[in-house]
């Protein structure tokens, strides 16, 4: 049964469209805000930098320090405590990143257009890195499955039992 896994062309096309949408929408919003509200591209790129630095680098580093060892065992042993921890960490790191971006860039701001550009950059890079890259990964796995089944995926990723994809 598992050897006959395939992904329909429609599903692959939808994944590609979602990936394309996550790339086009932020750029489209940036162009729209730039034209309509005279927002400046500097703020778009500040938003694009803040999200990966604070969430994907600093927050991930904090998780690696806190989730391994005794504190991590306590957090991971209680679903409610772990959910509280995850929400708190996400909020703290994203808001600290936004605060720093606003604190450093308010002196250059010339109105709400700049804030809109920052939001398009911050949310846009989040969409691209999380949804867009996920779609790219899903398409890669789907094509591997369609070309050679699980053997092709194992050749690409290693034994499935070690990757957590197969119980």
Predicted feature locations:
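Hydrophobic alpha-helical segments at protein termini of multi-pass membrane proteins
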Residues: 1-167
